[in-house]
Swiss-Prot record:
Domain statement: The first 21 residues target foreign proteins (tested with eGFP) to the BMC in E.coli. The cargo is only detected by Western blot in broken shells, strongly suggesting this protein is normally found inside the BMC and not on its exterior.
Domain of life from the UniProt record: Bacteria
Organism annotation: Salmonella typhimurium (strain LT2 / SGSC1412 / ATCC 700720)
S-S bonds: none
Protein's UniProt name: Acetaldehyde dehydrogenase (acetylating) EutE
């Protein structure tokens, strides 16, 4: 028999092995259920098949291949459905999650021995985990969470943002199909056909689900905190500042800042949101940025743009971002005030004071405020202020070790990038693993399978110490 014949036999056997007590059949595609109860029941049954580490490895390998194979399809669908972001950048995110999310290799048991015997500490699954995913990074978050949670031995009930339900459901279906085709359990990843706020709130309290993973903005994290007493791992908002001092490699800094601040139209919470630059190099840095497909706005143009992009500005200068403009292309934003920019424009930037609404608010669009300061000490202090205690991400461009050390200590973020774009902290151009769930509100930071296990201790007294 050739490989194709074997695959056909495996599929036929799997079909015969389906449990006749399986809940109401999925709607639309594999893993998408008409009701939440049916989805959770299917995920519970599927999770029983993950007790074997070999099965987890098989499922993860299939998910990696499917995630990469369908990365562009999912990127195009995400932009088409949500209107946010850039296809090429979403493609890069999807591929990065498929390749760079750690699997079972990052889970190691601990063994302690001593005069009183042996203690074994194992990584146990939670069982069925609920995952709330955003409209900004829909497919990438599904791929990332699927790998991390399955590696930890869990099945997943996804609650995708309603504005990205089609692409989220498509991703869930494609990954499920790949797992089943490889010989894994059906419905390791499930969701409902019509996700909404009520579905998410039910998941926050659903019996038998012990862990909630929430990736999104302040509102959804606050809602999860209010509506659940379950273990919560939450990824929230950020307002990442990037500081450039007088010692920086300015051409490199300009390239990195434009790349990072424009990546996927700035809808990743880890993207650069405000640039703080020492006055002596500010003009040259901005000139170099204009050579990287960035367009500088005048103060008058920024004044025109502000009421289009922000509403309800409070006494601190923080506004409510208009959802109509989140993640939109720089050219479309410029056109809103009658400004024509070159087609290849990736970023708009404008000089502002430190208290300007563009600097204070997490904009999540390719509009970057630039604030001049007298020296690096002032720059670092302002970066801490504008980061706002989110403890998310920050960056610095400098060739002075003392300056970088000073900012690293002061900024207190989960990710701090030196001499590169902020996305390098997520494995996109930097070393280390990747994730779409950066859990700053609950303190886990850059998540992996290790984040999603329960530690269990087993003790044998007065035995099995062999030295």
């Amino acid at each position: 028999m050739n490989q194709q014949d074997i695959e056909q036999v495996v599929k036929a056997v799997l079909l015969k092995m389906k449990d006749s007590s399986q809940p109401a059949s999925t709607v639309h595609e594999m893993g998408v259920f008409a009701s939440l109860d049916d989805a959770v029941a299917a995920a519970k049954r599927a999770q029983q098949g993950l007790k074997s580490v070999a099965m987890r490895q098989l499922a993860i390998h299939a998910i990696r291949e499917a995630g990469e194979k369908h990365a562009r399809e999912l990127a195009e669908l995400a932009v088409s459905e949500t209107g946010m972001g850039r296809v090429d950048d979403k493609f890069a995110k999807n591929v990065a999650q498929a390749r760079g999310t750690p699997g079972v290799e990052c889970l190691s048991p601990q063994v302690l021995t001593g005069d009183n015997g042996l203690t074994l500490i194992e990584n146990a699954p939670w069982g069925v985990v609920a995952s709330v995913t955003p409209s900004t990074n829909p497919a990438a978050t599904v791929i990332n969470n699927a790998i991390s949670l399955i590696a930890a031995g869990n099945s997943v009930v996804f609650a995708p943002h309603p504005a990205a339900k089609k692409v989220s459901q498509r991703a869930i279906t494609l990954l499920n199909q790949a797992v089943v085709a490889a010989g894994g359990p059906e419905n390791l990843l499930v969701t409902v056909a019509n996700p909404d706020i009520e579905t998410a709130q039910r998941l926050f309290k659903y019996p038998g689900i012990g862990l909630l993973v929430v990736t999104g903005g302040e509102a959804v994290v606050d809602a999860a905190r209010k509506h659940t007493n379950k273990r919560l791992i939450a990824a929230g908002a950020g307002n990442p500042p990037v500081v450039v001092d007088e010692t920086a490699d300015l051409p490199r800094a300009a390239q990195s800042i434009v790349k990072g601040a424009s990546f996927d139209n700035n809808i990743i919470c880890a993207d650069e949101k405000v640039l703080i630059v020492v006055d002596s190099v500010a003009d040259e840095l901005m000139r170099l940025m204009e050579g990287q497909h960035a367009v500088k706005l005048t103060a008058a143009q920024a004044e025109q743009l502000q009421p289009v992009l922000l509403k309800n500005i409070d006494e601190r200068g923080k506004g409510t971002v208009s959802r109509d403009w989140v993640g939109r292309d720089a050219g479309k934003i410029a056109a809103a005030i009658g400004l024509n920019v070159p087609d290849q424009t990736r970023l708009l930037f404008v000089e502002t004071p430190a208290n300007h609404p563009f600097a204070v608010t997490e904009m999540m669009m390719p509009v970057l405020p630039v604030v001049r300061v007298a020296n690096v000490e002032e720059a670092i202090a302002l970066a801490v202020q504008l980061e706002g205690g989110c403890h998310h991400t920050a960056a610095m461009h400098s060739r002075n070790i003392d300056n970088m050390n000073q900012m690293a200590n002061a900024i207190d973020t989960s990710i701090f990038v030196k001499n590169g774009p902020c996305i390098a902290g997520l494995g996109l151009g930097g070393e280390g693993w990747t994730t779409m769930t950066i859990t700053t509100p609950t303190g886990e930071g850059v998540t992996s399978a290790r984040t999603f296990v329960r530690l269990r201790r087993c003790v044998l007294v007065d035995a099995f110490r062999i030295v």
